[in-house]
From Swiss-Prot:
Species assigned in the record: Cottoperca gobio (Frogmouth)
Positions of post-translational N-acetylserine modification: 2
Lineage, top ranks: Eukaryota, Metazoa, Chordata, Craniata, Vertebrata
The protein, known as: Hemoglobin subunit alpha-2
Molecular functions (GO terms): haptoglobin binding; heme binding; metal ion binding; organic acid binding; oxygen binding; oxygen carrier activity; peroxidase activity
Expression sites (tissue/organ): Red blood cells.
Length: 143
């Protein structure tokens, strides 16, 4: 499913509204993923604390959302634009690409909670398509 020009415009506009809360979004989304999908904790076993909102969760949540922001900036060619992140996750971190979809779902949940008036059905569809495209781009080096 490719992103239409309208999807790209919608994603860019929505990101402009929510990016100032990127750290909070990332912390909540990652916290939710670790609680609801406890199998994802295996990637973070080196952290001393995995609880919701803990310092390592906050730090990595911000890192994740910086990556989302980078993807928004490179929305016209996610595969090439995110090649370094794809290689990192595939070869160094060895993250199961199914986890990208899990985290994407949690990001959408947090958008809906934090921005109920801005996260319209139209924005939801475009952001869902964008996060799916982002997950595909990150999975590129797994092939």
């Amino acid at each position: 499913m490719s992103l239409s020009t309208k999807d790209k415009d919608t994603v860019t506009a929505f990101w402009g509204k929510v990016s100032c809360k990127a750290g909070d979004i990332g912390t909540d989304a990652l916290s939710r993923m670790l609680v609801v999908y406890p199998q994802t904790k295996t990637y973070f076993s080196h952290w001393k604390e995995l609880g919701p909102g803990s310092p390592p969760v906050q730090k990595h949540g911000m890192t994740v959302m910086k990556g989302v922001g980078e993807a928004v900036a490179k929305i016209d060619d996610l595969t090439a634009g995110l090649l370094n992140l794809s290689e990192l996750h595939a070869f160094t971190l060895r993250v199961d690409p199914a986890n990208f979809k899990i985290l994407s779902h949690n990001i959408l949940v947090v958008f809906a909670i934090m921005f109920p008036h801005d996260f319209t059905p139209e924005v939801h569809v475009s952001m869902d398509k964008f996060l799916a495209a982002l997950a595909r781009a990150l999975s590129e080096k797994y092939r």
